Design a protein with these regions (language model features):
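Aromatic-rich peripheral "rim/lid" segments of glycoside hydrolase catalytic domains that contact
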Residues: 4, 265-313
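Short aromatic/hydrophobic "clamp" motif used to bind/position activated sugar donors
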Residues: 393
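A conserved acidic beta->alpha catalytic loop
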Residues: 336, 351-359, 400
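Conserved donor NDP-sugar-binding/catalytic core segment of glycosyltransferases
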Residues: 405-436, 500, 512
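Short, acidic, metal-binding catalytic loop of nucleotide-sugar glycosyltransferases
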Residues: 335-344
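Active-site mouth of glycoside hydrolases
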Residues: 29-195, 274
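Extracellular glycoside hydrolase catalytic/binding regions
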Residues: 151-152, 157-257, 284-286
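Short, flexible, basic/aromatic active-site loop/helix in glycosyltransferases
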Residues: 424-425, 439-457, 472
Length: 722
């Protein structure tokens, strides 16, 4: 754009702003200064280089562009190269944060040739030397879309290690900065758990396909935030009106999926690439002279409604919190509920005969308090359901704190679909102690089971919502489950009625884990008891050893993985050109999986008896070696699983850094023992009688049946059976 060319309306100088707080990734979203930060972004560049090699317009043009962006509701800008310091200062002055591309994909050739060295690392870091520590930096994107052909040539593991190495370099240079990598559907199989948040470029022009793929990406990213680094549509081939319409629903769909942010590609049609100005693409919200297209107003309206428009017909929701002696965490739960942003809801607290200060704490808040005698969790939940005035009943635990937009995401799922119930993720809070962080990284925590990216087989009780009429149709919760198992039983009964369950990643709650090893043991013993109760009611869902055969996949942190010699498979299509390339995990073998089962320890105990006998009787001395191997196997697997853990938050001190991984390994080894104790104590044994007929001797028996008239043989057998 020539100097002095029209660049849109003249805007007043920006008002003085308070200094930026650095962004943090917590759970499924980004936060800054204690407030949630939805990234409402637009991409910028690349432009024809100036004499200094910077691929940006002059400061006057950049300032006008940034002023227009801020005026239209944007709060973030994505650049593809490291900007000069003056551009960062201008961004901060206009309230814009920058996602800065460091161009790591441009040097991938050195990795292919095996020539990547310390000199290349210094050059990579020095390119952004003016950016480190600047308050306007949202995050550094260390690379953008390493080509699928290169990833296939090098191998996914090698690329993952290279990306992790680049992330480590940036973190050492700027310890407080967020770091990410921008991927795309063709390399979605890259496993990058070390990123602070995940970015994808996604261009899908049908709403249903975008909704489905966003749900998939949310499951791939797990407990980390998801940001779409590029969405957009070319107005040359599709027209400006269709571009505006498409971008509006792309933005709304992205944020409705629970994404933490989105960048619209691009701010302007002006684009320089490969040494030439590009004229046959026009993805910009403004034209080359910065005159606005219809898409600019459409995107502005959509961005200002993030995550949802408050107006509209939002269903009434009754939030039910049941508590028995939960005063330690109840206040945090109710504080979170008081910060809920939703136009039509109520909070009901059911005090299930507590002996502590639950009722006193609840009385301090604007909630409906119901006191009952101690009848157990299921009964308390039924009491809350009966008192609810909403058409949707949402349950959370007294040790959980919902996200401010929790109810919006749940309600949107009910409005869009026919699910009878909807759940969401439960994530350990960043302020939980280090032992609680280790517990969260260990097995046995509340986890959701998904049949597909949006359909659930099970949703945990700390974060679940149901249509009230669906709960009433099955008479609510089964009161035999006093502390655990009620949510599993309810989900199975709904499934029996053909009532589906859904899952939404944005409907997040912070869920405190047990803060002591002793309480973790007690919790797992209780879960073992609940398994015994469930097996007694649902024997057809359990195998001979007393374990559930889930039809879906279990999601959540702390899952134990068995050893396997099989490698994951990547579907890459003919010539490696499939646009969506997926990773398929190998099936774990029976022997490897059995090491994870509580009953493995029964085998270890039996071998211990034989090994002890072998000390005194030579023919049984082989049992000593078998016992040593059997006892060492779960310990070695626990150490392996603990080594794989990626703690979401850094250690606070040296003691924590040294102890949390050994403690996690100990909890992985201990958890099956606790479950075994609870299962055996309440009759869930491998030798239990599953038929209900007792022990019957295997001898032939005869019986006489008198029939007044002839009957077919099959009918005579039925008469005998009855």
């Amino acid at each position: 754009v020539p100097e002095g060319a029209p660049l849109g309306p003249v805007l007043p100088a920006p008002e003085a702003r308070k200094p930026f707080a650095r962004a943090r990734a917590e759970g499924k979203f980004l936060f800054a200064g204690g407030e949630k930060l939805y990234v409402r972004g637009v991409t910028y560049g690349t432009f024809r280089p100036d004499p200094d090699g910077h691929e940006y317009p002059s400061p006057a043009i950049v300032e006008r562009d940034f002023a227009l962006m801020a005026a239209h509701g944007f709060n973030a800008v994505r650049t593809y190269t490291a900007p000069p310091r003056w551009l960062l200062d201008l961004a901060e002055a206009h309230g814009l944060r920058l996602l800065i591309g460091l161009g790591g994909e441009r040097s991938i050739g050195y990795v292919c040739e095996g020539r990547w060295n310390a000199e290349h690392e210094r050059a990579f870091l020095d390119a952004a030397s003016e950016c480190y520590g600047h308050p306007a930096v949202l995050a550094f994107a260390i690379a953008n879309e390493i080509p699928a052909s290169i990833v296939r040539w090098l191998g996914a593991k090698r690329v993952e290690r290279h990306v992790e190495r680049l992330c480590t370099l940036v973190r050492r240079r700027d310890p407080g900065a967020l770091v990410t990598y921008v991927s795309y559907p063709t390399t979605e199989y890259l496993r990058l758990p070390f990123l602070d948040f995940h970015c994808f470029n996604v261009y899908l022009e049908q709403r249903e396909k975008l909704e489905a793929y966003l749900a998939r990406l949310q499951n791939l990213t797990g407990d980390r935030p998801l940001v779409l680094a590029e969405i957009g549509l070319d107005s040359v081939r599709n027209g400006e009106e269709r571009q505006a319409e498409t971008l509006a629903w792309q933005v709304r769909t992205t944020f409705a999926s629970g994404a933490a942010g989105a960048f619209v590609y691009a701010w302007t049609d002006e684009w320089h690439r490969g040494g030439e100005d590009v004229y046959d693409w026009a993805f910009g919200l403004t034209r080359r002279d910065r005159s606005p297209k219809p898409a600019l107003d459409a995107v502005e309206r959509a961005m200002r409604e993030v995550p949802f428009a408050p107006d509209g017909d939002w269903p009434r929701i009754s939030v039910v919190v049941c508590s028995y002696n939960g005063s330690r965490t109840l206040r945090d739960c109710l504080d979170g509920l008081m910060r809920i942003e939703y136009p039509n809801f109520e909070v009901i607290v059911v005090d299930d005969g507590s002996k502590d200060s639950v009722s006193a704490i609840a009385s301090e808040y604007d909630v409906r308090l119901i006191r009952t005698e101690n009848r157990g969790l299921s009964s308390a939940r039924n009491t809350g359901m009966e008192a609810a005035t909403g058409e949707i009943v949402a349950y959370t635990d007294d040790d959980a704190r919902p996200d401010p937009h929790w109810l919006y995401y749940l309600a949107d799922a009910f409005r869009r679909g026919t699910d009878s119930g909807v759940g969401g993720p439960n994530i350990v809070p960043p302020d939980d102690g280090w032992i609680a962080q280790c517990v969260a990284a260990s097995p046995g925590g509340p986890a959701h089971v998904l049949l597909s990216d949006q359909s659930a087989e099970h949703i945990p009780g700390c974060n679940m919502a149901f249509r009230k009429r669906a709960l009433q149709s099955i008479d609510g919760f089964d009161v035999r489950y006093r502390t655990a198992g009620d949510d599993v039983d309810l989900c199975w009964r709904l499934a029996e009625r053909g009532l589906p369950l859904g899952f939404r990643a944005g409907a997040m709650v912070w869920h405190h884990r047990r803060g002591e090893v002793r309480t973790y043991w007690k919790q797992q013993v209780g879960y073992g008891r609940a398994e015994a109760l469930l097996e007694a009611k649902w024997p057809e869902r359990y195998n001979a050893l007393g374990h559930v055969a889930w039809a879906g996949s279990i999601y959540g942190s702390g899952l134990s993985r068995a050893w396997t010699l099989k490698r994951p498979r990547i579907y890459q299509g003919s010539w490696g050109l499939a646009p969506f390339q997926r990773l398929y995990e190998p099936h774990e073998g029976t022997l490897a999986s059995s090491i994870l089962m509580p009953e493995w320890y029964l085998g270890v105990a039996l071998l211990a008896v034989f090994a002890l006998a072998g000390v005194f009787w030579a023919p049984l001395r082989f049992a000593i070696a078998l016992f040593a191997l059997a006892a060492a196997a779960p310990l070695a697997l626990a150490i392996t699983n603990a080594a794989r853990v990626r703690f979401p938050y850094p250690a606070r001190d040296l003691r924590e850094r040294l102890l949390r991984r050994p403690l996690t390994a100990f909890l992985h080894a201990m958890q099956p023992l606790a479950r075994l104790h609870g299962r055996l104590k309440h009759g869930l044994t491998p030798w239990r009688d599953r038929s209900g007929a007792g022990i019957v001797a295997p001898v032939a028996r005869g019986r006489s049946i008198w029939c007044e008239e002839g009957r077919p043989a099959a009918e005579r057998i039925d008469i005998d059976a009855n």
